Amino acid sequence: VMPNTPAQIRKGISAWTASKEVDQATLDFVSNMLRAIGDELKFGDEKSIDIATAVSGSGPGYVYVFIEALAEAGVELGLPVHMAQHLASQTVLGSAALQRESGKHPAELRNMVTSPGGTTSSGLAALESGGFRATIADAVHAAFERGEELAGGK
């Protein structure tokens, strides 16, 4: 089982697997227990758990860096620290909740908030030119590779 730190407030996600010998009653018990600390996803193999660890186990760290950077930019532009941090964290929380509750693909929601030639469009262009997507992918790959090293190169 690989939970993540938001499990501390029952908002986590746990990736887990079990051998084929485990009976359904035990699988149901584990699933229910994990749902007490958030969501859960059962995977069929250990490699998927290692990938999930790189995405969601390490993911809170990536999100916190994004919140820090977003808030720091607000402070640089003149907002008080506490207001910039509140804006940044609530924006991440609300955006994630909207995506989950709407069931829409993140790209669809991004397109809905982006007006041609508008402020979001300019900001997104800066993210893309700065290699934001590639940097996130690099972080996930680095975490996955480090996990394999720590596990002895599975």
Predicted regions, residues:
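NAD(P)-dependent Rossmann-like dehydrogenase/reductase catalytic/cofactor-binding core
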Residues: 89-154
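Gly/Ser/Thr-rich beta-alpha loop segments that engage phosphate groups in nucleotides
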Residues: 6, 14, 56-63, 119-120
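A short glycine-threonine-serine/GTX helix/turn-capping micro-motif
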Residues: 50-61, 110
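Internal alpha-helical scaffold of NAD(P)-dependent oxidoreductase catalytic cores
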Residues: 13-51, 64-101, 146
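Alpha/beta catalytic cores of group-transfer enzymes, especially the acyltransferase/condensing modules
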Residues: 6-7, 102
